Swiss-Prot record:
Covalent S-S links between cysteines: none
Origin species: Brucella abortus (strain 2308)
GO molecular function: 5S rRNA binding; structural constituent of ribosome
Protein known as: Large ribosomal subunit protein bL25
Domain of life assignment: Bacteria
Pfam families for this protein: Ribosomal_L25p, Ribosomal_TL5_C
Record GO biological process: translation
Keyword list, A-Z: Ribonucleoprotein, Ribosomal protein, RNA-binding, rRNA-binding
Length: 207
């Protein structure tokens, strides 16, 4: 699980475009905390802190503690809006979580030991089908990433979700099939040779 962090926030007494613009001029951005059968809470958080958290990676898979109005609220970032031109954060949605919370979260996939995959050594290409996997997981057990070991994989081999070790209590959101995460594809040269051989065999058969 990623290391948690603390965000200090202020309550927002006014909402709307005008107040949001004023917040941004003062180095803050609007945000909301919702969920856990409680009323949404409008807050303002530091633009600088959110910018670095978003662009530093792992933002939506890390539980945070927001300190606001004398309270500490555990949250999971669920969504954010960026300026379409400059990629500056404009707004953040936080979901309230507790020790018993189970959440849906997209976890990035990381690959290791490419040098130990014979298929890649022979010129094969790692074809990533899914760069992240949606998990249903306890909020206190969200992994930073799913690590996939490519050791021993040959050209034509695939990695399916059933081969991935998940954290305790975690399950894939997709349950109806053993979906593919990555394959070792043949290099273009090898494909061309195979196609040429196949065409030659067909020509012989037609004689």
């Amino acid at each position: 699980m990623s290391e948690t962090y603390v965000l200090k926030a202020d309550l927002r007494t006014r909402v709307g475009k005008g107040s949001s613009r004023e917040l941004r001029r003062n180095g803050q951005i609007p945000a909301v905390i919702y969920g856990d059968k409680q009323e949404p809470l409008a807050i303002a958080v530091s633009y600088k802190e959110i910018f670095y958290k978003i662009h530093g990676g792992g933002f939506k898979t890390t539980v945070a503690t927001i300190e606001v109005d004398g309270k500490k609220i555990q949250v999971l970032p669920k969504d954010y809006q960026l300026d379409p031109v400059r990629d500056f954060p404009q707004h953040v949605d936080f979901l309230r979580v507790s020790a018993k919370s189970v959440v849906h979260v997209n976890v990035p996939v990381h690959f290791k030991n490419e040098e130990a995959a014979p298929g890649i050594k022979r010129g094969g290409v790692l074809n990533v089908v899914r760069h992240d996997v949606e998990l249903i997981v306890p909020a206190n057990a969200i992994p930073e990433a799913l690590e996939i070991d490519l050791s021993g994989l040959e050209i034509g081999d695939s990695v399916h979700i059933s081969a991935v070790k998940l954290p305790k209590g975690a399950t894939p959101a997709i349950q109806d099939r053993d979906f593919t995460i990555a394959t070792i594809a043949a290099p273009a040269g090898l494909k061309s040779e195979e196609n040429a051989e196949g065409a030659a065999e067909e020509a012989k058969d037609g004689e």
